């Protein structure tokens, strides 16, 4: 039993010893933990320079500052978002359009320069500003429904005058001719001793392009010009813009018009060109072959047109009696009638007078014939000339004129030198270097003054040599490309060359007008051309007009510029 008691006592002692060391271990661990925390806190405070509780007052201020910075950053991000939207939605499409225009401009320029290099022209072709690409020689207003006369010209706009004026009282500048395609070409005649002198004159010829000023204004920039002051008396010149420069057709005159019609040989003619390098060259045409049936032959004064690698000029003059060309027209005539104003004369009498209208007494009874001359455009001037004589069952008595191309359509304007006063535009088709004319568009309110019995209101066939050159420019088209209306500047008087007004015309009536000056201001020839600034979608028309200028010369040639507006109430 004592042994058992001893065994129990020994186990109790061992248990107490274990508990004592366990307590010591726990206390030691606790002390080490507290020391570790204290050391760590001291180290952290030292490394971060921890603030005292009194410093916590500045924390709200710091938070407020941080909030301000975050708000500012968010505002900056909104600005960036706004700029991105503006760039994507607004600026990028405009930049893309401008890039497209520049590329098209470059392609056009490169095309002409390649052509010039191939033809040894020695100079690249200038081109219009990109703003005009797609706006020259195109159908500018395509509208099936609006009243044509709801389109009307603005007041005349100030722009750079690219036409030289007389500098003395006896100086005379007359007979302007203008054409525009890849460039624009202009020419007029210069006489030092009054407008009626036929013995000697100069010919001014210029080449240029359309520009847009920094403020958005349209202006015509002259890049090359020459004054042909030599022994050659060039008259009745027509000009055309071609891929090689400004091509010009002139007659060389040594006598009056009446004397020329009474002669037996054709009038000398010359084909010239002002190149992009500023050099002018010309070549005499073989008129004895080309105009063998003619006694007098002149360019139509109005511009020509570049079509199918050829330049097409209007021509008119007198046929040699009994020549093949003359006999081929014998008995042929056409009668055009005024709108809602029928001639009261007997039909047989009208036919007799219509036939006689082709042989006016002023030119000795010679048949005055309309024609069109085409010349191949190459470095060789006067190459492959082809003369087309349209039948007088389509055309009236031969007169000054103009060949125009608008879109894919070609037209011949014929001055109303005969009995028919309203402006005429013959649709023209070309094939195998020759032209075919078709029944004309007529514009009843677009008249010209004339001597009785062929005054502005005339309605019956008669034999006359009268009128004035005032060409219409095709402006408003149907969607099927047929012509609806034209722009032009006319002399609004029965008999006198007075009262210059601009308007848009349909086949019957005209729009509101823009008057050049007072109704008593003298004027003469006008030639008009329209174009569009594609960037702004604004349509402009240029009328080059001879206007009386009593201080310096009898006439001053003035380029009148208008914008075409729309009256939405019509």
UniProtKB/Swiss-Prot annotation:
Family: Belongs to the paramyxoviruses hemagglutinin-neuraminidase family.
Annotated localization: Virion membrane; Host cell membrane
Disulfide bonds: 172-195, 185-246, 237-250, 343-460, 454-464, 530-541
Intravirion topological intervals: 1-26
Lineage, uppermost ranks: Viruses, Riboviria, Orthornavirae, Negarnaviricota, Haploviricotina
Region (Important for interaction with fusion/F protein): 124-152
Transmembrane stretches, start-end: 27-48
Record's protein name: Hemagglutinin-neuraminidase
Record topological domains on the Virion surface side: 49-570
A Gene Ontology term for the protein's cellular component: virion membrane
Gene3D superfamilies in the cross-refs: 2.120.10.10
Glycosylation sites: 119, 340, 432, 480, 507, 537
């Amino acid at each position: 039993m004592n042994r058992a008691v001893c065994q129990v006592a020994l186990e109790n002692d061992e248990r107490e010893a274990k508990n004592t060391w366990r307590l010591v271990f726990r206390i030691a661990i606790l002390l080490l933990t507290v020391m570790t925390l204290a050391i760590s806190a001291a180290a952290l405070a030292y490394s971060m320079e921890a603030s005292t509780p009194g410093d916590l007052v500045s924390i709200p201020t710091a938070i407020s500052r941080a909030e301000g910075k975050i708000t500012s950053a968010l505002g900056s991000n909104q600005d960036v978002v706004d700029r991105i939207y503006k760039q994507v939605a607004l600026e990028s499409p405009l930049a893309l359009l401008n890039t497209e225009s520049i590329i098209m401009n470059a392609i056009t320029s490169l095309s002409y320069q390649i052509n010039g290099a191939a033809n040894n022209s020695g100079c690249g072709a200038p081109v219009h500003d990109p703003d005009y690409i797609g706006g020259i020689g195109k159908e500018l207003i395509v509208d099936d429904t609006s009243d044509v006369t709801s389109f009307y010209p603005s007041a005349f706009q100030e722009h750079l005058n690219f036409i030289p004026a007389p500098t003395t009282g006896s100086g005379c500048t007359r007979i302007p001719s203008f054409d525009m395609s890849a460039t624009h070409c202009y020419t007029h005649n210069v006489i030092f001793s009054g407008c009626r002198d036929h013995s000697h004159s100069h010919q001014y010829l210029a080449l240029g392009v359309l520009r847009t000023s920094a403020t958005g204004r349209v202006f015509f920039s002259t890049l090359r010009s020459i004054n042909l002051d030599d022994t050659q008396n060039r008259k009745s010149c027509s000009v055309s813009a071609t891929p090689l420069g400004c091509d010009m057709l002139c007659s060389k005159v040594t006598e009056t018009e009446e004397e020329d019609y009474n002669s037996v040989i054709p009038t000398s003619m010359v084909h010239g060109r002002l190149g992009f390098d500023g050099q002018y060259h010309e070549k005499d045409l073989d008129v004895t072959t080309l105009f063998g049936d003619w006694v007098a032959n002149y360019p139509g004064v109005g511009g020509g047109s570049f079509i199918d690698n050829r330049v097409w000029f209007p021509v008119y003059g007198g046929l040699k009696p009994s020549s093949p060309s003359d006999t081929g027209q014998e008995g042929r005539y056409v009668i055009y009638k005024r709108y809602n104003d029928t001639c009261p004369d007997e039909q047989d009498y009208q036919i007799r007078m219509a036939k006689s209208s082709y042989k006016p007494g002023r030119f000795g009874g010679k048949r005055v014939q309309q024609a069109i001359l085409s010349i191949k455009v190459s470095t060789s001037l006067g190459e492959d000339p082809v003369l087309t004589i349209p039948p007088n069952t389509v055309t009236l008595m031969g007169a000054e004129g103009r060949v125009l191309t608008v879109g894919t359509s070609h037209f011949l304007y014929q001055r109303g030198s005969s009995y028919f006063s309203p402006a005429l535009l013959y649709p023209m088709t070309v094939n195998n270097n020759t032209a075919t004319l078709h029944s004309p568009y007529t514009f009843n309110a677009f008249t010209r003054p004339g001597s009785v019995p062929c005054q502005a209101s005339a309605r019956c066939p008669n034999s006359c040599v009268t009128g004035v050159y005032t060409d219409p420019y095709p402006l408003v088209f149907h969607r099927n490309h047929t012509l609806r209306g034209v722009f032009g500047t006319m002399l609004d008087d029965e008999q006198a060359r007075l009262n210059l007004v601009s308007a848009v015309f349909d086949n019957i009536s005209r729009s509101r007008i823009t008057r050049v000056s007072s109704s008593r201001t003298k004027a003469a020839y006008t030639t008009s051309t329209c174009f569009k600034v594609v960037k702004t979608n604004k349509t402009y028309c240029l009328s080059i007009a001879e206007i009386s200028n009593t201080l310096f010369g009898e006439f001053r040639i003035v380029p009148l510029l208008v914008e075409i507006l729309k009256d939405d109430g019509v």
